């Protein structure tokens, strides 16, 4: 599963600005245009999967009424796999949660990937700027029917939390600007650890393909619908999310 967006699309930009006050757009880090840039990385991402992980059954590209138009390049190198590439609109995975659309928040989108129709129980989540560079086996991602976690146990990100707190204090007290704290993948993962009772350490995953279990995600969010809704309500990425 690959999450993708083309930030240069004028329709998407217009939609995004609708949810931003003209005075807010520079104060919300999650609305920074650089978060939505596309340099055609999606083509290389897809081709790398087809070449180096041919055992992958399907590739789902999740997007908001957009199309990366990669059929021709896939047809050129892997003509037999064109039908295995499927575009999934946000409306499909947010069915029943349409009030939270549109969203411009990759965390919210990732929370809903398990709702893709025809998705295998074992699936791998890619960002469009992540590529495979050599042949791999399924065991790289799953062993004994369980996801392989890639990362390391870390102490809580105290340094980042303290620095962010000081910066926020300086901006609001000295500069008089209420600028939101910049969302951090360390802090967002720490927030997830806190939800599960971890107080003194957390497991930090890097910017890498993530092996996931659809049933576990479904079970968790079914048992904790309010936590899901709390995460989904932020149209732009936020510091407090998990």
What is each model feature region?
Residues 1-7:
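Short, hydrophobic/glycine-enriched beta-strand segments
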Residues 67-68, 112-155:
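GT-A fold catalytic core of metal-dependent nucleotide-sugar glycosyltransferases
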Residues 26-33, 37, 69-119:
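Active-site-proximal specificity loops/subdomain of glycosyltransferases
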Residues 8-12, 67-72, 95-96, 131-135, ...:
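Short catalytic/ligand-binding loop motif for oxyanion handling, primarily in non-cytosolic enzymes
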Residues 57-66:
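Short beta-strand/loop segment that forms part of the nucleotide-sugar
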């Amino acid at each position: 599963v690959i999450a993708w967006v083309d930030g240069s699309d004028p329709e998407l930009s217009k939609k995004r600005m609708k949810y931003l006050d003209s005075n807010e757009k520079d104060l919300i880090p999650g609305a920074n245009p650089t978060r939505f840039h596309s340099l055609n990385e999606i083509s290389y991402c897809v081709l790398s999967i087809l070449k180096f992980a041919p055992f992958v059954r399907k590739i789902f590209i999740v997007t908001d009424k957009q199309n990366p138009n990669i059929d021709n390049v896939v047809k050129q190198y892997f003509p037999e796999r064109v039908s295995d590439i499927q575009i999934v609109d946000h409306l499909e995975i947010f069915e029943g949660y349409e009030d939270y659309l549109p969203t411009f928040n990759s965390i919210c989108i990732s929370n809903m990937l398990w709702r893709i129709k025809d998705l295998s129980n074992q699936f791998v989540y890619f960002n469009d700027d992540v590529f495979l560079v050599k042949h791999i086996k399924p065991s790289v991602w799953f062993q004994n029917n369980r996801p392989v976690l890639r990362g390391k146990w870390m102490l809580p990100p105290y340094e980042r939390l303290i620095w962010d707190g000081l910066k926020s204090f300086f901006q609001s007290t000295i500069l008089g600007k209420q600028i939101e704290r910049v969302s951090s993948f360390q802090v967002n993962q720490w927030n997830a650890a806190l939800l599960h009772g971890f107080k003194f350490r957390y497991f930090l995953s890097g910017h890498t393909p993530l092996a996931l279990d659809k049933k576990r995600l479904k079970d968790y969010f079914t048992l904790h619908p309010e936590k899901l809704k709390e995460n989904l309500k932020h149209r732009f990425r936020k510091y407090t999310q998990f």
